[in-house]
Amino acid sequence: MMYSKIIGTGGYLPSRIVSNDELSQSMQTSDEWIYSRTGIRQRHLASPDESCSDMAFYAAKRALENAHIEADAIDLIIVATSTPEHIFPSTATVVQSRLSCQRAAAFDVQAACTGFMYALNTADCFIKSGQYQNVLVIGAEVFSRIVDWQDRNTAVLFGDGAGAVVLSASEEAGILGTILHADGSHKELLWVPQGIGSSETDFATRRPFIEMQGREVFKFAVRSLTHLVSELLVQCQMSADEIDFLIPHQANSRIIQAVAEHLNLPIEKVIITVNQHANTSAASVPLALDYGVQNGIIKRGDNLLLEAFGGGFTWGGCILTY
């Protein structure tokens, strides 16, 4: 049986770091208020001249270097993002050009914070079908551009960054199983209402920023993700004690804790970066994975459970052997 296996990871975070204390100087909040509710201490924010494709490119370069593979060996590039700098062309095509991946196909996917899981599954299917051998999968976001910095309920939650993996055909076990879900009936609980195709034409009434009903999102996320991880274990015919590390979407420490407790996983078996990165949306999971790999926490042969939840609602996850 042919598998798809992650052979390299990479990450990129903008150099500007904004602490909770710095945010408290421009809005009614505090480090204690933010940290106690989210687990976030700081976030990285893109500079004015830094774009989504810039960050995707830097993360991709590092993933290629760590995979010890040349750019011209890549068959396909998939970028998961909700914050591209262009309506078209896709961010993936911009990255393809900058990497000089001359023969690679390229496209974007959009599933909000679950985007990387959707992109990874798409890459996995392409490889298992035999169509492609090496796929570059990237999650990249500049959510600072769609956050209302006067709204403390959302502004404190998000950061910018990019994470990437090289997924390659392998006879060794890699991705063992994936489950994806969506429920569009709850779209208004977490969304950016204004889009280019919106029927709203009055600029004064446009709503171009993230709007969220936090309490409802939290309840739905915990319920959905705890059920999801149980589904994944059944699909892969595994028990929770066979999971070496949980790599969750880094949105909120309380959601992360709820999923870990459902799996009876000690916190030492959970990769947590939300305190340093905040919620980087589609970049969240690959950034956390890269953090674990680069710091020697995750090793070859470890069984990993990845999961994410985002606007839509969308949610999904996979179990893989690293």
Swiss-Prot record:
Catalytic residues (positions): C113, H249, N279
Chemical reaction(s) catalysed: malonyl-[ACP] + acetyl-CoA + H(+) = 3-oxobutanoyl-[ACP] + CO2 + CoA
One MF annotation (Gene Ontology) recorded for this entry: 3-oxoacyl-[acyl-carrier-protein] synthase activity
Signal sequence range: none
GO biological process, one term: fatty acid biosynthetic process
Top-rank taxon, per record: Bacteria
A Pfam family the protein falls into: ACP_syn_III
Subunit structure: Homodimer.
Protein name (Swiss-Prot/TrEMBL): Beta-ketoacyl-[acyl-carrier-protein] synthase III
Species per Swiss-Prot/TrEMBL record: Dichelobacter nodosus (strain VCS1703A)
